[in-house]
Regions:
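N-terminal glycine-rich FAD/FM-binding segment characteristic of electron-transfer flavoproteins
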Residues: 1-172
Length: 172
């Protein structure tokens, strides 16, 4: 386990986060970098893609599964009407979908073993610092809520369908 810890990372944007991760990854040997599809990057789904770009590696977004096949990695993505299977050479970066892996409940021996694993912690200075952000966040706002009538029609009866169509026409 490797981690970079610094209070300056609390407000890092996707580019800054990816830059720090890429710098840390350059310090170690790896075959595969697995990222979530989005989280602290305001769910913009950019960090994994940026890490791959900064490292010059193949990167696949929205991955459902990854498995080793000889010297290659087989990466599956569920598209609208099909499953896409890509063969890529490691090292590579993948961003997994949130439903790709169901979390399991660890057994006590797994928890105890995890506590004994080595953890390498670096400061920002040890990985080259944090770059200036090319983006300035002016504000983050939620969309304005719209008052709705809240009409619920139960069942697909001819009467309900007629009422729905009449309601739509009346609101125009």
């Amino acid at each position: 386990l490797y981690r970079v810890v610094d209070p300056a990372l609390e407000d890092a944007d996707a580019f800054q986060t990816a830059s720090v991760l890429a710098a840390a990854l350059r310090k170690i040997d790896f075959d595969l970098v697995v990222c979530g599809e989005g989280s602290a990057d305001r769910y913009s789904q950019q960090v994994g893609l940026l890490v791959g770009a900064l490292l010059g590696l193949p990167v696949v977004n929205a991955t459902g599964s990854v498995r080793a096949e000889g010297d290659a990695l087989l990466v599956e993505r569920v598209l609208e009407n099909e499953v896409e299977v890509l063969e890529i050479a490691p090292p590579a970066v993948v961003s997994m979908t949130s439903d790709a892996v169901l979390p399991r409940i660890p057994q006590l021996k797994d928890i105890l073993a995890a506590g004994k694993k080595p953890v390498t912690t670096w400061s920002l200075d040890e990985v080259g610092g944090i770059p200036e952000s090319p983006v300035e966040t002016v504000s983050v706002k939620a969309p304005a809520s719209i008052a709705r009538k809240g009409i619920v029609l139960e069942g697909a009866t001819d009467e309900n369908i007629g009422e729905l169509v009449s309601g739509i026409r009346a609101s125009r």
